[in-house]
Amino acid sequence: MDPKRFTRRLVALGAAMFLCALVFVVTLFDAQIVNGDDYLAQSIRTNAKSETVKASRGVITDRNGKVLVSNRAVYTLNFDSSLVSSDELNDALLRVIDLMNAQGVEIKDTLPLARTSPYAYDTANGSAKTLVKYLVSLKWINEKNVGDDGLPTTLTGSALYLKLRSEYGIDKTLPNSTVRTLIGLRYSLASAKMNGSTTFEFASDVDVSLISLIKDGNYAGVQVDTSSVRVYETDYAAHVLGYTGSIQDWDDYKDKDGYTLASTVGISGVENAFEDYLHGSDGKRLVTLNESGKITGELYSVEPKPGSTVALTIDIDFQAQVEEALKNTVSSMTKSDGIDRGAAVAVVQVGTGDVLALASYPTYFLSTFRQDLAELSTDPLQPMWNRATQGKYAPGSTLKPLTAIAALESGATTVREKIYDSGKWTYPGYSASYTYCWKRSGHGSLNVRGAIMNSCNYFIAEMGYRMGMDTLREYYAKFGLGAPTGIEIGDTAGRLPSQNEGENLAPWAAFGQANQEYSPLQLANYIATLCGGGDRYATHLLKNVRSSGSGALEYVYDAEPVETIAMSSENLSAVLAGMHDLATDGAVSQYFKDCIVDAAAKTGTIQTGDTKNNNGAFVCFAPYDDPQIAVAIVIEKGGSGAALASTAVQVLNAYFSNTSASSAITGENTLLG
């Protein structure tokens, strides 16, 4: 070969190789230096996924630090439809159904339809609001086609079942039970998509053996995650603690920062009231995925911040004793007369408004209430209703101490004035308008102290007549009646007394009639205000909030009076002495002789039109010479208030026998009913 020709070829080959190398270097430079960030972002978008790492909810304790609600780490199973083609979606979900059925694992179902034919609507399964929103989006109904129960009126449950089966392209030859489960899963996916997500949770708290089967079986779209579930460390205080649920049923949370469609939120009780403290801050992680959607690596993460620890004002040991005493009293009454009844107790600390115990009967168990929900929802006594805060009852004679102090302070009477009780009080100028004292023969000559001790209707009716309705309402309102008490879980405002057309009902309002109604908590707080010298505090359940990590205090409740009612010491002493006389020498003294603390009390019999079904009410405070706690009890169809006295003594003794156990309890007392 010609050497020159060979040299030229060699030069040409070298030049070509140089050009190839140059192109490679330029491309590499562009990929890594010039446009490196863009290429990396594109790679991440293609092969990685951002995931939320749920923060565990904060722990709830009682006033002494005893844990009431905590968390337990669990495995959850999610389905991500973005990892499965639409043609393969039903088949992928059917594989999941077969696996869950084989392992005996319950699949979460948020579709508010019964699981079996004829597929009637059943809101115990899911939210009616979410269903209606979905059906409106499909143009199957409009928002006008919704009944008072929040469910469609123009589409039956069975018709919806058939339409959804068709909408989701489900094989008609499948067993009905399988079709219903598959419809539920597809509906859960549709609900998630309405809120901008492709992922939904279909099983929680699953066993590790199932996790192994999931990983080994290559179940398309299925992802394993970790979460936490609430653990209830007590069987008591269910109405106070409340429960959590899915955010999808609660629109109030959906637009708040820090929440996702998978979030668990507080629905009732302190779980709801202190959501901002308990929720915590979710973390974030970016994970790489293979073609099947399995996580192959983690690119970065932001650690979740658990919710804060919330300490309540209640003493759980005392709460348990109050609930047991109330249950025993009601059970004994029911055993005797066969009448089912509800009841409630509220115990408030004088001078702070701390709620030390709230008992509502019947109650329920937070650890099993979801399984018991159908039974609880149909129970005529409504076990999930918090009678202590939401119950509205005529106060009866428990209101007489307040009427008495109003009469003294307004100048309607004095501590020295005596009025003769003949047994029948007649409205001046109207002989047809009258009321009898419970003692038909009358009490004879009484002052205000004696009137309270003897629960004299004659004396109190005269005070109501002298003051008039406006003055009564003014004083009742000062003591917090007719308005919420401030408790964070919410309570009824109750109702102040009112007039009927053409009548002056002030004499009857004075001893607890005339259309007025209050909750047991309102009655307890009025007594706390009275025996506390006129300082009225908002009732509350929050004691403090601490960081879940360091334990550092983040918030401490600072009790300040919301109102101070001026009362002369002479007037107040006379009223409180009348209550003390009742407990020591009056109608309930036989019960209070066994009380380990000196107490003062007032009974109340609330007429319901049937003397056999009169409600019983009872209020107390103790110790008499240094009031620490106030208590109110109401037992529906409980008869006279005196019948509640023995229960009150049980609770007082339980409370004071525990005062030496902890400095946090010392100086607090209670009463029950």
What is each stretch, according to the model?
Residues 1-276, 282-303, 336, 343:
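Membrane-proximal periplasmic segments of bacterial cell-envelope enzymes
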Residues 57, 73, 218, 325-352, ...:
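Flexible, solvent-exposed loop/hinge segments and secondary-structure transition points
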Residues 69, 75, 289-302, 314, ...:
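Beta-lactam-recognizing serine transpeptidase/beta-lactamase-like catalytic domain environment
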Residues 82-83, 635-639:
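A generic structural motif
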Residues 90-98, 208, 212, 216, ...:
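Solvent-exposed, polar/charged alpha-helical surfaces in well-ordered, non-transmembrane soluble domains
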Residues 252, 279-282, 293, 323-327, ...:
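Amphipathic, well-packed alpha-helical segments that form the structural scaffold of globular domains
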Residues 295-343:
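Conserved, well-ordered alpha-helix/loop/beta-strand core segments that scaffold catalytic motifs
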Residues 531, 583, 649-660:
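Short amphipathic alpha-helical signal-transduction/dimerization elements
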